[in-house]
Amino acid sequence: MRNVKNYTPKEIVAELDKYIVGQKEAKKSVAVALRNRYRRSLLPEDFKEEVTPKNILMVGPTGVGKTEIARRIAKLVEAPFVKVEATKFTEVGYVGRDVDSMVRDLVEAAVRMVKEEKLKAVTEKAKKLAEERLIDYLLGKKKKQPKNPFEMIFNYPSSERTEEPDNVDSYKREEIRQRLRSGELDNHMVEIEVTDTTPPMLEMYTNLGAEELNITLQDMFSDLLPKKKKLRKVTVAEAKKILEAEEAQNLIDMDEVIEEAVKRAENDGIIFIDEIDKIASTGYSAGPDVSREGVQRDLLPIIEGCTVMTKYGPVKTDYILFIAAGAFNVAKVSDLIPELQGRFPIRVNLKPLTKEDFVRILKEPKNALTKQYQELLRTEGVEIKYTEEAIETIAEVAYLINQQSEDIGARRLHTVMEKLFEDLSFHAPELSGQEIVITADYVKEQLKDSLNKYEVNKYIL
């Protein structure tokens, strides 16, 4: 696995600490699971096949960091990663998404990732080729291309152009090259010929689900039919970007990209299944549980290890890491079918957030809400400062409202902060150049309606 080999479990936890407060146990479990992917890659081939990832089940109330841990992990390790909602799936045979689609989504993510890497690797070469093409267009030098038989059959516009002598003054080319590189020609208009990437409107679907065998005519005949060209009149600056992208695309081997992507999805892929508690059968409902027990049974072979057909070929799920998360406030973990429970050997309980956690959430993370509002209002020329008491009061209000109503964890801070900054955000353009200090009294004044509504006024000192 790329990147993660540079991180020890302790370093992975340290990276997560920059964005997520507390939940050490969950962070440690995820860090060890990621490090084990790297350790497995170093094993001898004959033994490597015997080592499968230990899937993780994160249990905890909403808003304590389950999804955020998954999001940050995906960015950190740069592995193919997809996040899916368990509630979106239905049992095979019913209308809706089937569980195989999560594996197809993972492969798509892997293809995008590998393709971006390959495109990045050929950027410099693509720039040079694009520059030569652009100089040709600016000089009016156009090549005469033979007409493809298919172009005549399908009435494609002719690619024929007037060919100019090859002895175009090299001095003139060099002069245009220098003007191009200096940006002098950026606003000039130029007509360029590009490949038409608009997909055909007609698509073929099977009754197995729209995305299961969604075969477009473009996929079927892309190699057979000629690429349709079209003329576009754009600025030179825009033409550079368009031609660079087209040349880069021509330089990469998509077969190689797909082969690498499938391999990476199989060995490094991570699938995060959110809201898994919502497909637990509580025993209170009558009738068929289309999106509950049936979905759980469909998940079993994928998590255990099977082969899923995708448009890029068969993909084995044996070594994909599955991380599931759920609040389990209505259903219990034991309400999941026993076979599915057994597929998640590592179980982590995330703790509800305390007032002290809220204070830390407002102060410590790199993307703390307090910092976000400071930066947003700084764009209007307004400087925001917070007193220590103000931050503690905001945390206390959020915590108490959670206690008195639905506990939505750290998401409550978004509601409280938005209400707190409602007036300031509205009047910010008129306050340009001023420094505003947020005090505890200001917080109480701005949030008095919320405090009265939830009757938490009496709890705040």
Swiss-Prot record:
Q: Name one GO molecular function term.
A: proteasome-activating activity
Oligomer and partners: A double ring-shaped homohexamer of HslV is capped on each side by a ring-shaped HslU homohexamer. The assembly of the HslU/HslV complex is dependent on binding of ATP.
What's in the keyword line of the UniProt record? ATP-binding, Chaperone, Cytoplasm, Nucleotide-binding
Q: Which family does it belong to?
A: Belongs to the ClpX chaperone family. HslU subfamily.
List, alphabetically, the CDD domains matched.
RecA-like_HslU
- Where in or outside the cell? Cytoplasm
What's one Pfam family here?
A: AAA_2
**What's the encoding gene here?**
hslU
Residue positions annotated to bind ATP are: 21, 63-68, 274, 339, 411
Q: Which GO terms describe its cellular component?
A: HslUV protease complex
Q: What is its main location?
A: cytoplasm
GO-annotated biological processes: protein unfolding; proteolysis involved in protein catabolic process
Q: What does this protein do?
A: ATPase subunit of a proteasome-like degradation complex; this subunit has chaperone activity. The binding of ATP and its subsequent hydrolysis by HslU are essential for unfolding of protein substrates subsequently hydrolyzed by HslV. HslU recognizes the N-terminal part of its protein substrates and unfolds these before they are guided to HslV for hydrolysis.
Report if keyword ATP-binding is assigned: yes
Q: Where are the transmembrane segments?
A: none
In Swiss-Prot or TrEMBL terms, this protein is called ATP-dependent protease ATPase subunit HslU
